[in-house]
Amino acid sequence: MKIIYQGVRAGLLASLPFVAVLLLHGTLASSANRSATSQATPPSGPEITASETIPPEELEKEMADQAKPIVVCVAPRFLYDGAHIPGALFHGPGSTTDGLKDLRHWAESTPRDRAIVLYCGCCPISRCPNIRPALGQLREMGFKKVKVLWLPKDFHTDWIEKGYPIEKAR
């Protein structure tokens, strides 16, 4: 009996690395599936229509006009401080309660017929957690001339690397 027990014990011990690999693989696979699922889930807020977007080259031209739009950054503070569109207002991330509260406070005293351009640029616009909530809030407040800066990849790639003007926080 002792010999059988030692044989079974040795077999179990020998198989532990294999079992550990299987468990680890299952954990990583389920983690990867959760990650892929969360990336595939669109951010909350209203859809952005093509007519509500503005490409960087068009915004640059409009910024030179007398009646230029109000540009509002709804990205995290560190992105705004690092580099932002000249003259852009910062109202905090659109995905946070404080950011939306600050945006609402500013918007309450802003004429509803003013042209506004929102941008974030933290990530591809299709996954941005900040744009849609901010856009939804301005829509709810009655703003009709709100556009979203079209940044398919991020602010650095689609604005800075293409040579559009920037300024840094003071």
Predicted regions: what is each one?
Residues 2-13, 17, 21-53, 81-170:
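Rhodanese-like catalytic fold shared by cysteine-dependent sulfurtransferases
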Residues 50-64:
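A short, well-structured juxtamembrane/interface segment
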Residues 56-60, 76, 102-105:
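A generic local structural motif
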Residues 59, 70-75, 88-91:
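Short hydrophobic beta-strand that contains or immediately precedes a catalytic carboxylate
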Residues 63-71, 87, 145:
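Short active-site oxyanion
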